[in-house]
Amino acid sequence: MRSDKIKKGVEQAPARSLLHATGQIKSPGDMDKPFIAICNSYIDIVPGHVHLRELADVAKEAIREAGGIPFEFNTIGVDDGIAMGHIGMRYSLPSREVIADAAETVINAHWFDGVFYIPNCDKITPGMLLASVRTNVPAIFCSGGPMKAGLSAHGKALTLSSVFEAVGAFKDGSMSQEDFLDMEANACPTCGSCAGMFTANSMNCLMEILGMAVPGNGTTLAVSDARRDLIRESAFHLMDLVKKDIRPRDIITKDAIDDAFALDMAMGGSTNTVLHTLALANEAGIEDYDLERINDIAKRVPYLSKIAPSSSYSMHDVHEAGGVSAIVKELVDLGGAIHPDRITVTGKTIRENVADAKINNTDVIHPKENPYSPVGGLSMLFGNIAPKGAAIKVGGVDPSVQVFKGEAICFSSHDEAVEAIDNHTVREGHVVVIRYEGPKGGPGMPEMLAPTSSIVGRGLGKDVALITDGRFSGATRGIAVGHISPEAAAGGPIALVHDGDIITIDLPNRTLNVDVSDEVLEERRKELPKFKAKVKTGYLARYTALVTSAHTGGILQIPEDLID
């Protein structure tokens, strides 16, 4: 066993003494059992994580029943909704790397035989995923699960995105204070990840088709007994993985990454999943995975399930309608959309996992014969503003908008843009350009949920577009193009756009262009000032120095002279 490194031999007597002191070694035979890490992310200020201590206790009990010795450790978490719109958001994406590094550190320092990961919210799941393929120790994931949708006094289903959009409506005078406060109080009624197909739930759904979590992981409610049952089931599967020495890199292959994007297309997941899945491919050693490949997948996968913020349906509605398994079963039956014979943590293939799945509500999950769209709900755009690509959640765009042409109004920060939207400087026909908010420029590639929500909340969702080298919350909808790469801070051409330039967003042709000649853009480049980092000390300064643009997944790049 891997853990023999710390518990076998005369030389490890001091280590054994310390292990006895933990209280986890309850009999002499325990030293002969697999040591299983529980990588938890319990934290009181994140509603998606307040119940994870309880879930870890369920996992510990099941691991002991299955013949392992559990050792729990914790990592950090950032709540993107609470960190939104201020300096806290600059720490959100960088927290992914902290989580990956922290988990790697504990797992490798203590030679665990297996790892049970318990994530839930936005950057925690991808951070743990990066750690799982980096350490490549047998592992399984079981998230904390989504919260229930809220309900307004008027009987309207609510999610967190409802509140963000209500801010714009209230500021604009189109919502009463009574309705505004009612929405604030009732949008998030339980613990769990936010109730729509936002980033957290998108990632937790993708875990099922990646093969790293059991069916039900993405949609089973946080407050349900079924969530505890999933934890127990996952613990027993993990012990089988340890026994058979099946590792994350055996499961997360190039085909698995393809299938993750296929499910993403079918369910209209968050654009943040693109960032995280590209980073996962890089960490897993999968070469030549680019945005064009994602577009190729989108062209062969139909859009089957439109969930909040793109509709009023919540994750619980998806669960009741058949869950992720029902969507995946449609893709299996479609033929050629995914690779269904890959192995998963259950010991079965994707095909076997979903063999008995069916759609229970065709309003929530459309059958493959009647999709929302014959192509996927995410799209990668290319053009002279985004030569390395950009991302848009086309499932969140009004279907009447296929091509948007408008006049650029440019801002060098999130806050400048929000102020201009609030004071009505931004008007119909504008393309709001927010740059220097990418991974390096932000730093941390903050989410632009406040400006997009204000635009939609004011009823301008079809009349104003927003493009940025920053990113969006999974709660974003409207004509919102993010992840523009290279970013402005890396000299990307988004930095060369001027007020009044005409920008065209062409969804059918997947292009994003400014109507300015290459010669003019090169002249403008000569006048472009050198980027200066906004943060000079601490973690964000180190992050700025190492991070790359969105087309890589926003990974940290080790200087070549250190690895040659």
Curated annotation (Swiss-Prot):
Cross-referenced InterPro entries: Dihydro-acid_dehy_C (IPR042096), DihydroxyA_deHydtase (IPR004404), DiOHA_6PGluconate_deHydtase_CS (IPR020558), ILV_EDD_C (IPR056740), ILV_EDD_N (IPR000581), IlvD/EDD_N (IPR037237)
Record-level Gene Ontology MF annotations: 2 iron, 2 sulfur cluster binding; dihydroxy-acid dehydratase activity; magnesium ion binding
EC number: 4.2.1.9
Cofactor: [2Fe-2S] cluster; Mg(2+)
Cofactor: binding details: Binds 1 [2Fe-2S] cluster per subunit. This cluster acts as a Lewis acid cofactor.
UniProt-listed GO biological process terms: isoleucine biosynthetic process; L-valine biosynthetic process
Catalytic activity: (2R)-2,3-dihydroxy-3-methylbutanoate = 3-methyl-2-oxobutanoate + H2O; (2R,3R)-2,3-dihydroxy-3-methylpentanoate = (S)-3-methyl-2-oxopentanoate + H2O
UniProt-listed PROSITE patterns: ILVD_EDD_1, ILVD_EDD_2
Protein's job: Functions in the biosynthesis of branched-chain amino acids. Catalyzes the dehydration of (2R,3R)-2,3-dihydroxy-3-methylpentanoate (2,3-dihydroxy-3-methylvalerate) into 2-oxo-3-methylpentanoate (2-oxo-3-methylvalerate) and of (2R)-2,3-dihydroxy-3-methylbutanoate (2,3-dihydroxyisovalerate) into 2-oxo-3-methylbutanoate (2-oxoisovalerate), the penultimate precursor to L-isoleucine and L-valine, respectively.
Family, per entry: Belongs to the IlvD/Edd family.
Protein known as: Dihydroxy-acid dehydratase
Lineage, broadest ranks: Bacteria, Bacillati, Bacillota, Bacilli, Bacillales
Primary gene name: ilvD
